[in-house]
A protein has these predicted regions:
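Conserved aromatic-histidine-acidic binding/catalytic patches
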Residues: 16, 20, 39-40, 64-67, ...
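Conserved S-adenosyl-L-methionine
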Residues: 65-174, 182-184, 188-191, 195-196, ...
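Long recognition/docking surfaces used for binding and targeting
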Residues: 1-59
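A conserved structural/catalytic subdomain of Rossmann-like adenosyl-cofactor enzymes
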Residues: 166-169, 174-380
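Short, functionally important structural connectors and interaction interfaces within domains
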Residues: 61-62, 124, 232
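S-adenosyl-L-methionine
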Residues: 45-70, 77, 81
Length: 380
């Protein structure tokens, strides 16, 4: 546990805080002892991940410069629904962070079985993770041990240095990942792009494995030639099922990134005629509350249920919410790319649009540029 020696040396953790009336370290320790330990073995929340985030703030950073973005619980639970995780699945999270995906997957699995033997087998064999940063690896390991995992299958290693063919031998049926963001700075670090992490994970899974990743929307665009080539390689070997655009404020609070969830099927080449789902899930039933963060509203359950019914083809939806389309590697794999607003404008919208156009036309006339309005003109 030497990774946590920094706690002893951080003045912000060990000096009395006027608002708390004690040191933050003492406050957190007492809170964990009184509030967390009694319930941590059964809660669905990644509580240790939350406390890690608070410690990082007091230690002088938020982790974002390193691309660290912790995944909220309502997102990890949504992954379990979209990927339809069962007790028979073998899950891999190659960028495990504090273990939030694995915690949600564990809860989903053990709540679906009855005997202690089945639950023990799941905890000891069906949950696997890789994490590069030692401090988060320690938290993830602790997270799993506190939940009764007697054989934590976590490895402190660099996922991108792992041979996909070797990982395939472990026959992972589900992949879940929130890769580091924005680590690609130049040509030398191009291999650190989010889409490269996605391909590496897909290549590492078993045949027909389900894979879900949460990445910046820009990763689905193909920001440069290298990323576009990776998208092409992905479709040669794997199938894109769909992409769900999320609300940046209610997914990654204060990160400044607008994310999306992409769902794939591994080692099944993408059929040219396949129509993928592209969903706009910005209205997710959560809100951003000042001084609190992300807050669940009374609409959250209904919005999630609506999303899942659309995803499972149990419900049709207007194109402003969901579009089904064939794709190409050069496309931007996002709802905003495929969506065309074919709704008729109401009277007020029509008047505003016409007013704006007439103002634009009048300005051209006043500048003696009315020739630009005529059809067939070249503008040399």
């Amino acid at each position: 546990m030497h990774q946590f020696n920094f706690i002893k040396d951080r003045p912000n953790l060990n000096e009395v805080d006027d608002n708390l009336g004690k040191t933050p370290l003492k406050y957190f320790t007492e809170y964990i002892k009184d509030k967390i330990f009694p319930a941590i073995s059964t809660t669905h929340e990644d509580i240790l991940g939350f406390f890690y985030g608070e410690f990082i703030k007091y230690s002088g950073g938020d982790g974002q410069s390193l691309g660290i973005v912790l995944t909220p619980t309502h997102i990890t639970e949504l992954f379990c629904d979209l990927l339809e995780i069962t007790p028979q699945d073998k899950v891999l999270d190659p960028c495990a962070g504090t273990g939030s995906f694995l915690v949600s997957a564990m809860n989903r699995m053990i709540n679906s079985v009855e005997t202690k033997e089945e639950k023990r087998y799941i905890k000891e064999n069906n949950l696997h993770g890789i994490e590069l940063k030692e401090n988060m690896f320690s938290i993830a390991t602790t997270n799993m041990i506190l939940r009764g995992d007697g054989k934590t299958n976590l490895v402190c290693a660099d996922f991108l240095k792992q041979n996909p063919q070797e990982l395939r031998k472990d026959k992972y049926t589900v992949g879940m990942m929130n890769p580091p963001y924005s680590l690609r700075k130049n040509q030398e670090t191009a291999y650190l792009s989010e889409i490269h992490f996605v391909k590496h994970l897909l290549d590492s899974l078993d045949d027909n494995a389900r894979c879900g990743v949460i990445v910046p929307q820009s990763a689905m665009v193909g920001k440069n030639k290298e990323d576009k080539n990776i998208k092409k390689e992905i479709l040669k070997n794997h199938t894109l099922e769909g992409v769900i655009s999320l609300n940046g404020d209610t997914s990654f609070y204060r990160v400044g990134t607008i994310p999306c969830i992409a769902i794939f099927t591994a080692h099944r080449p993408h059929p040219q005629e396949k129509r993928c789902k592209f969903i706009n899930f910005e209205d997710d039933g959560y809100k951003l509350s000042k001084h609190v963060g992300i807050v669940k509203t009374e609409r959250a359950i209904e919005r999630k249920e609506h999303l899942l019914r659309c995803w499972r083809d149990q419900l049709d939806a207007p194109s402003k919410y969901m579009v089904k389309s064939t794709i190409k590697p050069t496309d931007e794999w996002l709802h905003s790319f495929y969506y065309f607003n074919d709704e008729l404008p109401n009277k007020e919208e029509f008047i505003i649009t016409m007013s704006n156009y007439l103002t634009f036309e009048f300005d051209l006339v006043m500048q003696n540029k009315e020739y630009l309005l005529k059809d067939g003109n070249n503008y040399d």
